[in-house]
């Protein structure tokens, strides 16, 4: 059953009419609360503790019911610090799950897990709210057509295309361009698809969240002059927050995205950075609730928790949520239960390479390591599939020949291999692209390249029609016509120098 957004106030607005309990026990972020007989709150209900601590400071802590213990007690997990709470303090049952603001009012703003703005830009319109716990769309509501989500980024669209309503894993270390790629995707979905984006910062560094916000303002993704014209809503639950907040912040972001899909009927991009921290927070909460740990100390409900989040990310007949999830792999062990459970849900992987970033090729997407279940002839068509396979074969052959080139030099290769290397180097450079959001740093205007143009460009390189052009003509251009124009400019400049 789908729960439709309400148009009343937030879930904690009718506190006066709710039943009251008292804190019986506090263990870190976990509270045991006693209620009168017959007035037990439901699982996932929001509880609010209000009062003053020993030094007179105001306390306002929201918790979520996780277990019914018997003896009229429930166990709840706090969404903020429990400092100053004491046994015997009054607890109010709101009678509903956590509800957060949704709709256009969220764009350009930063929220915490409770849907409260934390950017000092004043209150948010909370007339339309939605509960964070909802069931996934029913089968009959799903859109089962397999269609590609065009991003306008050549390397992604050609070699590891995204599925509309799919889930993509983004792998990459620090400083290889994850943030810039994320911002370009946010920019392109707004311009090409009329869509919006929601960014969920789950358990990552506060500094990174702040840097992302500043860069979004600088690049125009967040419009400071007219905040309603912004293209993204931000929801942060960072590393310093209690595990309850980190476990639920992904659901808060997803709830905002669902409104844009179901009510506004838009295509939505949902970014989750980092999906591993969602699992990690669930593991902490599971231990605090006294559950028996499973493999490698993870929660026994790992697959269920991951599934309940991921199954809500999908295409319906109204719109789509396409999710891009940064995946941290602990100790680079892909068999660890957290990344292994995540992989089961992914439709595509985009792997960023430090080697390509060091060469100055941006976006630094590895053409050989990045994969997609969409790259099949029956989905993308024979022409696209054949072109992508030939690009990969040429790149793979170049990779195999690099050791020989390093030892013996290019002249020792056969004529055929020299030709392969020349074309592979052109392909490598043509996979780079100027980004709209990087204009302020690079000075070169951004380019959106349609899929048909991308395929045509790579076909011309592979066919040998452009063998006479210098490889630097292919670097940081949009479509292939720009590369040929750039080559002609080089020719004119060299003649003038002579």
Swiss-Prot record:
Alphabetical list of PROSITE patterns matching this protein: ATPASE_ALPHA_BETA (PS00152)
Matches recorded under Gene3D superfamilies: 2.40.10.170, Bovine Mitochondrial F1-atpase, Atp Synthase Beta Chain, Chain D, domain 3, P-loop containing nucleotide triphosphate hydrolases
Cystine pairings recorded for this chain: none
GO biological process, one term: proton motive force-driven mitochondrial ATP synthesis
GO molecular function, one term: proton-transporting ATP synthase activity, rotational mechanism
Catalysed transformations (reactions): ATP + H2O + 4 H(+)(in) = ADP + phosphate + 5 H(+)(out)
Cross-referenced CDD domains: ATP-synt_F1_beta_C (cd18110), ATP-synt_F1_beta_N (cd18115), F1-ATPase_beta_CD (cd01133)
Organism domain of life: Eukaryota
Compartmental location: Plastid, Chloroplast thylakoid membrane
Cited SMART domains: AAA (SM00382)
Binding site for ATP: 172-179
Cellular component terms per the entry's GO annotation: chloroplast thylakoid membrane; mitochondrion; proton-transporting ATP synthase complex
Pfam families, alphabetized: ATP-synt_ab, ATP-synt_ab_N, ATP-synt_VA_C
Principal location class: plastid
InterPro entries the UniProt entry points to: AAA+_ATPase, ATP-synt_VA_C, ATP_synth_F1_bsu, ATPase_a/bsu_AS, ATPase_alpha/beta_chains, ATPase_F1/V1/A1_a/bsu_N, ATPase_F1/V1/A1_a/bsu_N_sf, ATPase_F1/V1/A1_a/bsu_nucl-bd
SUPFAM superfamilies, sorted: C-terminal domain of alpha and beta subunits of F1 ATP synthase, N-terminal domain of alpha and beta subunits of F1 ATP synthase, P-loop containing nucleoside triphosphate hydrolases
Membrane topology designation: Peripheral membrane protein
UniProt entry tagged with the keyword Transmembrane: no
Assigned EC number: 7.1.2.2
Keywords, comma-separated and alphabetical: ATP synthesis, ATP-binding, CF(1), Chloroplast, Hydrogen ion transport, Ion transport, Membrane, Nucleotide-binding, Plastid, Thylakoid, Translocase, Transport
Oligomeric and partner information: F-type ATPases have 2 components, CF(1) - the catalytic core - and CF(0) - the membrane proton channel. CF(1) has five subunits: alpha(3), beta(3), gamma(1), delta(1), epsilon(1). CF(0) has four main subunits: a(1), b(1), b'(1) and c(9-12).
Record-stated family: Belongs to the ATPase alpha/beta chains family.
Described function: Produces ATP from ADP in the presence of a proton gradient across the membrane. The catalytic sites are hosted primarily by the beta subunits.
PANTHER family named in the record: ATP SYNTHASE (PTHR15184), ATP SYNTHASE SUBUNIT BETA, MITOCHONDRIAL (PTHR15184:SF71)
Record-linked HAMAP family: ATP_synth_beta_bact
Stated name of the protein: ATP synthase subunit beta, chloroplastic
Organism: Galbulimima belgraveana
